[in-house]
């Protein structure tokens, strides 16, 4: 690069000025430049700092040479490349339309025709990339640029989509990539964000998320942080996106095929390139494409702007409104993840993070696209969500041409009639007549009461409620999918124009009703149609009219941070003591209501399992409520264990294997979660540390001492689960039986209080707000004493005494645990390990397991030390004088000798782990992230402490070795392996005894700790017989834990 004239800099045949900055990222800045001779050829010059690139500079140069040969109209052209001393300059094609992210921010959603136009161009570019074996790995709306040859107001037909920034992400350092990709993990494939092996199908997942966002306005799966999204993917083996009901069948099938969690089940590139959705069928009548939005220079958020009326869609007639109901009738089911948006007075630019509700108006009858008569309506649901007074079409006669009214105003307009345009992106509207149309509105209301309304479809309109606040209303009743006469599906339309953000009122989710309707919603959502008799017990007349209104698609992507908002609307168990907190006051008998009908229970969606449908997924820990509503929502505790949800729903889940390697943040108690393949110490038989030679074979006497008659033999498959130990009823995950329950009489079972959830880091008991409580008793009424929190299984101390809960089964729901304030959230830092390479993750997992195993061995050494101190007491001195042959076993020196052996083994393991970490860091396989530094620092501290302990014990044992020479021959029988195995056996014995006597507060953590000790011991042993014995013990413990988990979930 050479400095040019007038402050310009030169890169080859191009020049640019650093004043013309058009964009910047974490590692690069982009300037606008031009050709030095052809001044009308505008370019974008991207400057990348070399410090942000990996060491493989030659590979980057080769890749750039390949990219220079990529000539495609839908790929940003790379004109030139120059490498300087400190920077790399890329001269690329300039796109004047911005990127797709800005386009979606302005448009919110796109029509299927526009999506098809864009997707056809993306597929064309991907076809070329796939043929050359190039994986983008970072497809997102920010990397899809738009180019308009005729300017920014060009029609979507003339927009050229171009893919940019491919081939460079792989050359960024891993920790750097974690910083620059903090905004795009929700577009990354699950196998990429979980640091697993991936192939080109990862780009297909990203394309699916982009198409989904174009359709609904948001990504299909969201979380408050990349780490939460990674945990969500790890917990859910099957993912089903919520697709709007009015989506066409080809697009629906395309999204479901692209958004498959398992890359093996995902469609391949050939299927994608030849998908029916990409082929524009001439027989299908398409809706007009969405025009490009204007980019105002000033932040004009006025709701009365009339400049957007040229982009608005045509209104539906009253007859089409009825047709829309017949076609799209559905209750509000799992799509109703309502989320409070910002104040309606804010500008449209300030509402980009809120959930938007997009109007789907029906067009003229000729524009309706009907599917096959036998086609069933899509299983997704619609909910009519309200906006402020957007005038509804059809309130006037045919011969009158209504004038447009201010879109989405917060009060009725004093002048002008009901507007024909649905200019709000907020949602459906409540028709409130302006003063000049009161008589027409009254006439329509009278027509609604007449029995001839089904012969005059244009006389039907939505009955407005008595409130002028923004309202949302759900469909009155669903249309059964088996009715083929109502199977026509509307082509997806959208309404455009400026408008204020949607602000829901407390009545969101309710429906307006007319006189004569019963205030009690039908449990099956039965629909009253003309000519059909109503259901038994219904107070509606035989020809009760159906609610007429515009169907509005609710943007219902399962936002993991918003689920708690809708939970007050879910049906509560009859015995829930908190069930009346959110339920409206009940009238004595159900009477006809002239206001709003109470919210209908949400119906299960066929796309999610039933147990998840009865209660939505728990909110992700620390997830924010993106907007502050006018009323406060309760805080939710951070117990996010899905097993709590399963236990509440009565679903039995038997994990195939129990976890033996928790994360570093979970060192201490264990909670019975199954060990996934990504959490295992490794399949390498050598394990995280090398085996040592067994000084003696582990005898079967220890097995028999541990399991009694249940000691496993080579041909036996019996376990603790099948033995008399089973007489103890299962309590829970580390269930803490409070003293009040233990003191109960024998005539009835004692109520059991147990906790479910993930504890905080460390060995301290979890805080109160982090505990989810369940209280179970035999029979009777509910009690509110179950809301008291007790320490979880982290501490061995008994739980504090609580008032005995009343008989009955009561569940303290997390949503009601804290009602005093609004949800607050501080954005967490992005963990560096989120997007590290697989090799780095495996090495770090081995170091973590070594640290955890060593800590448990140190606990054994501490116990030996305490026993040695106790052996110096007068009681032990008396025993030594009486039982002379047991002096070696009861003396303090013997305990010191055992401690010394354990500390030596710990020092050996830590030294091996530290040396391995150093070698891996030097080899470049292990990155120096903050977590790695923390683990290595802790390993080093423990190593130094172990060496100091060995030196001190060696000095203490000098007299032991001098005075008791006859015991030197027995010193060889002291091995760290035998001590660890004996301690694990003792833990299993004590846990089994406590479980038999129904003292279960520490059984599950002890089982887990013993299982982890045996797991580490298995990596240390070299004798095959010893390894087989340890494996049998592990199987017995795992079966017992599985039985406990099964009993808890049941």
UniProtKB/Swiss-Prot annotation:
The keyword ATP-binding applies. GO terms for molecular function: ATP binding; GTPase binding; identical protein binding; protein serine kinase activity; protein serine/threonine kinase activity; protein-containing complex binding; small GTPase binding. PROSITE patterns: PROTEIN_KINASE_ATP, PROTEIN_KINASE_DOM, PROTEIN_KINASE_ST. Keywords: Acetylation, ATP-binding, Autophagy, Cytoplasm, Kinase, Nucleotide-binding, Phosphoprotein, Serine/threonine-protein kinase, Transferase, Ubl conjugation. It catalyses: L-seryl-[protein] + ATP = O-phospho-L-seryl-[protein] + ADP + H(+); L-threonyl-[protein] + ATP = O-phospho-L-threonyl-[protein] + ADP + H(+). CDD domains: STKc_ULK1. The keyword Cytoplasm applies. Changing residue 784 to C: In a lung adenocarcinoma sample; somatic mutation. Residues 16-278 form the Protein kinase domain. Residues 436-459 have a biased composition (Polar residues). It is found in: Cytoplasm, Cytosol; Preautophagosomal structure. Residues 295-317, 410-425, 775-786 have a biased composition (Low complexity). ATP binds at residues 22-30, 46. Belongs to the protein kinase superfamily. Ser/Thr protein kinase family. APG1/unc-51/ULK1 subfamily. This is Serine/threonine-protein kinase ULK1. The gene is ULK1.
């Amino acid at each position: 690069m050479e400095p040019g004239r007038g402050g310009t800099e030169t890169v080859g045949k191009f020049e640019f000025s650093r004043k013309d900055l058009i964009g910047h990222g974490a590692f690069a800045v982009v300037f606008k430049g031009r050709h030095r001779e052809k001044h009308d050829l505008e370019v974008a010059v991207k400057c990348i700092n070399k410090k942000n690139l990996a060491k493989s500079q030659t590979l980057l140069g080769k890749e750039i040479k390949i990219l220079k040969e990529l000539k495609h109209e839908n790929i940003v052209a790379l004109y030139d490349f120059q490498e300087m001393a400190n920077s790399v300059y890329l001269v690329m094609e300039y796109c004047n339309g911005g990127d797709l992210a800005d386009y979606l921010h302005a448009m919110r959603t796109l029509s299927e025709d526009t999506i098809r136009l864009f997707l056809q161009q993306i597929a064309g570019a991907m076809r070329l990339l796939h043929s050359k074996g190039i994986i983008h790995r970072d497809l997102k709306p920010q990397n899809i640029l738009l180019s308009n040859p005729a300017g920014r107001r060009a029609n979507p037909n003339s927009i050229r989509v171009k893919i940019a920034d491919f081939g460079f992400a792989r050359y960024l350092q891993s920790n750097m990539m974690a910083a620059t990709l903090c905004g795009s993990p929700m577009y990354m494939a699950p196998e990429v964000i979980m640091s697993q092996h991936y192939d080109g199908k990862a780009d297909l997942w990203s394309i699916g998320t982009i198409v989904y966002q174009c359709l609904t306005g948001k990504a299909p799966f969201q979380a408050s942080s990349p780490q939460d999204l990674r945990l969500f993917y790890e917990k859910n083996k099957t993912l089903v996106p919520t697709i709007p009901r009015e989506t066409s069948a080809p697009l629906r099938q395309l999204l479901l095929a692209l958004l498959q969690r398992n890359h093996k089940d995902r469609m391949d590139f050939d299927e994608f390139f030849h998908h029916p959705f990409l082929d524009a069928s001439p027989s299908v009548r398409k809706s007009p494409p969405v025009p490009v939005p204007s980019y105002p220079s000033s932040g004009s958020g006025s709701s009365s702007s009339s400049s957007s009326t040229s982009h608005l869609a045509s209104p539906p007639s009253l007859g089409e409104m009825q047709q829309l109901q017949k076609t799209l009738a559905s209750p509000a089911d799992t799509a109703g993840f309502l989320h409070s948006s910002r104040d309606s007075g804010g500008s449209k630019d300030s509402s980009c993070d809120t959930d938007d509700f997009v109007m789907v108006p029906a067009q003229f009858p000729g524009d309706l696209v009907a599917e096959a008569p036998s086609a069933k309506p899509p299983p997704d649901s619609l909910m009519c969500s309200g906006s402020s007074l957007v005038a509804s079409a059809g309130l006037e006669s045919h011969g009158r041409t209504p004038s447009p009214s201010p879109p989405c105003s917060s009060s009725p307009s004093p002048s002008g009639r009901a507007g024909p345009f649905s200019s709000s992106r907020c949602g459906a509207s409540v028709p409130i007549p302006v003063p000049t149309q009161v008589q027409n509105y009254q006439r329509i209301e009278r027509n609604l009461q007449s029995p001839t309304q089904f012969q005059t479809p244009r006389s039907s309109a939505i009955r407005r409620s008595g409130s002028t606040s923004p309202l949302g209303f759900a469909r009155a009743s669903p249309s059964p999918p088996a009715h083929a006469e109502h199977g026509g599906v509307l082509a997806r339309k959208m309404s455009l124009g400026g408008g204020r953000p949607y602000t829901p009122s407390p009545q969101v989710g309710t429906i307006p009703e007319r006189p004569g309707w019963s205030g009690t919603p039908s449990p099956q959502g039965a629909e009253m149609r003309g000519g059909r008799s109503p259901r038994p017990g219904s107070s509606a007349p035989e020809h009760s009219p159906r609610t007429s209104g515009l169907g509005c698609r609710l943007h219902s992507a399962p936002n993991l941070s918003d689920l708690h908002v809708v939970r007050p609307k879910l049906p509560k168990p009859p015995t829930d003591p908190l069930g009346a907190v959110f339920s409206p006051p009940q009238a004595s008998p159900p009477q006809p209501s002239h206001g709003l009908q109470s919210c209908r229970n949400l119906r299960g969606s066929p796309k999610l399992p039933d147990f998840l449908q009865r209660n939505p997924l728990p909110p992700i820990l620390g997830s924010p409520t993106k907007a502050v509503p006018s009323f406060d929502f309760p805080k939710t505790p951070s117990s996010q264990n899905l097993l709590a949800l399963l236990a509440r729903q009565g679903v039995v889940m038997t994990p195939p294997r129990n976890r033996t390697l928790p994360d570093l943040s979970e060192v201490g108690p264990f909670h019975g979660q199954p060990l996934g393949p990504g959490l295992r110490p490794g399949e390498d038989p050598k394990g995280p540390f090398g085996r040592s030679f067994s000084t003696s074979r582990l005898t079967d006497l220890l097995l028999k001492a541990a399991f009694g008659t249940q000691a496993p033999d080579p041909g036996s498959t019996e376990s603790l689960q099948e033995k008399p130990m089973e007489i103890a009823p299962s309590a829970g995950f580390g269930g803490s039986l409070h003293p009040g329950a233990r003191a109960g009489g024998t005539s009835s079972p004692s109520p059991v209080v147990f906790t479910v959830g993930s504890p905080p880091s460390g060995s301290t008991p979890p805080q109160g707000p982090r505990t989810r409580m369940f209280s179970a008793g035999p029979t009777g009424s509910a009690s509110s004493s179950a809301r008291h929190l007790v320490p979880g299984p982290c501490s061995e101390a008994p739980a504090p005494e609580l008032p005995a809960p009343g008989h009955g089964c009561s569940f303290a729901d997390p949503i009601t645990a804290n009602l005093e304030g609004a949800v607050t959230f501080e954005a967490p830092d992005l963990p560096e390990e989120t997007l590290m390479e697989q090799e780095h993750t495996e090495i770090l997992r081995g170091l973590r397991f070594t640290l955890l195993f060593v800590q448990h061995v140190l606990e054994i050494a501490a116990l030996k030390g305490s026993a040695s101190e106790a052996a110096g007491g007068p009681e032990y001195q008396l025993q030594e004088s009486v039982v002379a042959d047991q002096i070696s076993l009861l003396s303090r020196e013997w305990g010191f000798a055992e401690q010394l052996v354990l500390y030596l083994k710990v020092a050996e393991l830590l030294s091996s782990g530290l040396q391995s970490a150093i070698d891996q860091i030097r080899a470049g396989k292990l990155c120096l992230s903050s977590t790695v530094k923390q683990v290595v620092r802790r390993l080093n501290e423990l190593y130094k402490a172990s060496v100091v302990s060995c030196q001190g014990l060696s000095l203490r044992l000098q007299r032991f070795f001098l005075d008791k020479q006859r015991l030197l021959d027995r010193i060889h029988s002291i091995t760290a392996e035998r001590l660890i195995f004996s301690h694990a056996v003792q833990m299993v014995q004590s846990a089994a005894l406590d479980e038999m006597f129904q003292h279960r507060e520490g059984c599950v953590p002890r089982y887990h700790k013993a299982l982890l000790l045996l797991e580490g011991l298995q990596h240390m042993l070299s004798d095959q017989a010893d390894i087989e014995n340890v494996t049998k013990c592990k199987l017995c413990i795992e079966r017992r834990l599985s039985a406990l988990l099964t009993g808890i979930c049941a």
